[in-house]
């Protein structure tokens, strides 16, 4: 009987380890968020927050060279200020920045450009009540399996090499040094004036989200910063 239970426990341990490995290998977490959890506690003086307008503009590596302070950049593609609020709550569990810079385009978005993009933030560490609360604003409990990267993974079996390469490299990624760009993502994309004018005429995406929610979450961000002695 003892041997059977021992085998069962060993099987569960191996299965759990493989599941965690698969979760990490198939994660959609951004490099900036993955590296964030490697930072020494309370080592960041200034944090830049927002969507792509944020992490394709501010360059902590340059700022840190010019000003005697440590800065870092966090955000996800197409996020609005609701996501910024939950990201700030997560950040404040590990850092106490003196200054929080929130780029204003996050305030202009009435909704996420694509809810699935929030996995750039959610996948970066273990699930907690705050992350679950954010997720429930956009998804139903019947889709809860999507909270686990391994369960929502769709491997392209025509070209599986990328996944297997990631799977093999996953254990070593925990020991990688923090990317010197510290969340900054350079881009080569340029929108021509004509393309910009055409984009202004595109119909808006239907949404039940109200801009009043942005004001609500901006106030919550202001309160969080005050409570933690961070200048916004």
Functional labels for PLM-detected ranges:
Residues 22-28, 49-50, 76-80, 209-211:
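Short, flexible loop segments at the rims of nucleotide/cofactor-binding pockets, characterized by
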Residues 118-230:
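Secreted/periplasmic serine-hydrolase-like ester/acetyl group-modifying domain
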Residues 43-44, 69-70, 96-99, 226-231:
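Loop/turn elements at helix/coil->beta-strand transitions in domains of secreted/extracellular proteins
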Residues 4-24:
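Hydrophobic membrane-insertion alpha-helices, especially the h-region
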Residues 49, 53-141:
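Membrane-embedded segments
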Residues 31-34, 56-58, 86-89, 216-221:
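Alpha-helical scaffolding within the catalytic cores
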Residues 25-44:
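Alpha-helical transmembrane signal-anchor/signal-peptide segments
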Residues 44-46, 73, 205-207:
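A short, structure-level motif marking secondary-structure boundaries and short turns
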């Amino acid at each position: 009987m003892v041997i059977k239970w021992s085998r069962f426990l060993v099987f569960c341990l191996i299965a759990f380890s493989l599941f965690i490995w698969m979760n990490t290998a198939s994660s959609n977490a951004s490099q900036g968020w993955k590296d964030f959890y490697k930072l020494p506690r309370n080592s960041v003086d200034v944090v830049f927050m927002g969507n792509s307008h944020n992490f394709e503009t501010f360059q902590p590596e340059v700022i840190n060279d010019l000003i005697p302070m440590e800065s870092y950049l966090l955000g996800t593609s197409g996020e609005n200020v609701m996501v910024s609020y939950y990201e700030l709550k997560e950040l404040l569990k590990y850092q106490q920045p003196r200054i929080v810079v929130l780029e204003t385009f996050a305030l202009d978005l009435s909704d996420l450009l694509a809810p699935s993009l929030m996995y750039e933030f959610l996948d970066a560490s273990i699930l907690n009540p705050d992350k679950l609360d954010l997720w429930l604003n956009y998804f139903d409990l019947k889709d809860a399996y999507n909270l686990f990267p391994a369960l929502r993974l769709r491997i392209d079996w025509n070209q599986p090499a990328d996944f297997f390469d990631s799977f093999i490299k996953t254990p070593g990624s925990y020991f990688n040094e923090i990317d010197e760009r510290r969340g900054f993502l350079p881009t080569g994309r340029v929108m021509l004036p004509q393309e910009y004018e055409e984009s202004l005429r595109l119909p808006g995406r239907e949404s039940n989200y109200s801009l009043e929610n942005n004001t609500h979450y901006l106030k919550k961000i202001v309160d969080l910063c005050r409570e933690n002695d961070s200048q916004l």
